[in-house]
């Protein structure tokens, strides 16, 4: 999995799949570290930390998150999992964010179908309860390999834009799309995905309107919509973090 995902740490599938992707990787790395008494640990690797902090960076506010591809538009993730991940990679950002997601509630570990994750969550409830709730992130977050860019300003504007290509994980034909939020309220939205059916993962996936470029914040050029495939991609995608500038050629 580490060799499959991009080194920049972004999750193409979005925050709603993060718990099954980077979150599950964290579980396995924790088992590996615990089983070897810390002798084998990857938590110091910058890539692993970036994979964790993707959750706090993708959180717009008031429950809304960046939702490219099949991702849900709401849901910040499991606070206990985010806290444990943050503690392992020494990310104050993640630990504060986990407390922020609780919104004043007491941490509560549910006994789900993942015994390891449930037991680990039980062990950190008290620590999370003591953490300072805070959601702080840089004004610009740029994932150069995945080509995701998040920018915000002091006036409450948050822009999420992407380059990419049309054969990503849980792909939509959406190379070059963007979403805009004002004071955490979605203004220019990504419609996301409907209820999964057999068609969603079959040969007729791109007959579903939510998968088509026409229903993203993208132009139809000369009556032609974007097509599915590795070769249909954005090019010359750049982000100037200092000047808060993002550009991509579709």
What are these regions (language model features)?
Residues 20-188, 239-241:
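Carbohydrate-active enzyme catalytic cores, enriched for enzymes
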Residues 1-14, 27, 126-133:
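Active-site lining segments of carbohydrate-active enzymes
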Residues 9, 146-147, 192:
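Glycine-centered flexibility sites
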Residues 166, 245-250:
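Acidic, contiguous internal or C-terminal segments within carbohydrate-active enzymes
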Residues 158-240:
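Catalytic core of carbohydrate-active enzymes
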Residues 5, 33-36, 223, 227:
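Alpha-helix capping/termination and helix-coil
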């Amino acid at each position: 999995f580490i060799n499959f995902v991009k080194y920049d740490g972004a999750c193409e599938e979005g925050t709603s799949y993060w718990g099954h992707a980077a979150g599950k990787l964290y579980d396995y790395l924790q088992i590996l570290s615990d089983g070897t008494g810390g002798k084998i640990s990857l938590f110091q690797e910058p890539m692993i930390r970036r994979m964790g902090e993707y959750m706090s960076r993708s959180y717009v506010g008031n429950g809304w998150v960046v939702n490219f591809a099949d991702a849900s538009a709401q849901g910040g993730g499991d606070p206990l999992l985010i806290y444990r991940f943050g503690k392992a990679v020494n990310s104050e950002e993640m630990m504060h964010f986990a407390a922020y997601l609780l919104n004043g509630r007491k941490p509560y570990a549910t006994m789900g179908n993942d015994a390891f994750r449930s037991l680990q969550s039980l062990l950190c409830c008290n620590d999370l309860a003591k953490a300072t709730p805070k959601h702080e992130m840089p004004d610009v977050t740029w994932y150069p390999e995945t080509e995701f860019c998040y920018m915000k300003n002091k006036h409450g504007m948050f822009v999420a834009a992407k380059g990419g290509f049309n054969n990503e994980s849980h792909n939509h034909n959406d190379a070059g799309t963007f979403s805009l939020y004002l004071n955490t309220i979605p203004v220019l939205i990504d419609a996301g995905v409907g209820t999964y059916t057999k068609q969603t993962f079959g040969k007729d996936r791109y007959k579903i309107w939510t998968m088509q470029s026409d229903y993203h914040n993208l132009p139809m050029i000369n009556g032609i919509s974007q097509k599915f495939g590795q070769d249909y991609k954005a090019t010359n995608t750049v982000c100037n973090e200092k000047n808060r500038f993002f550009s991509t050629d579709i």
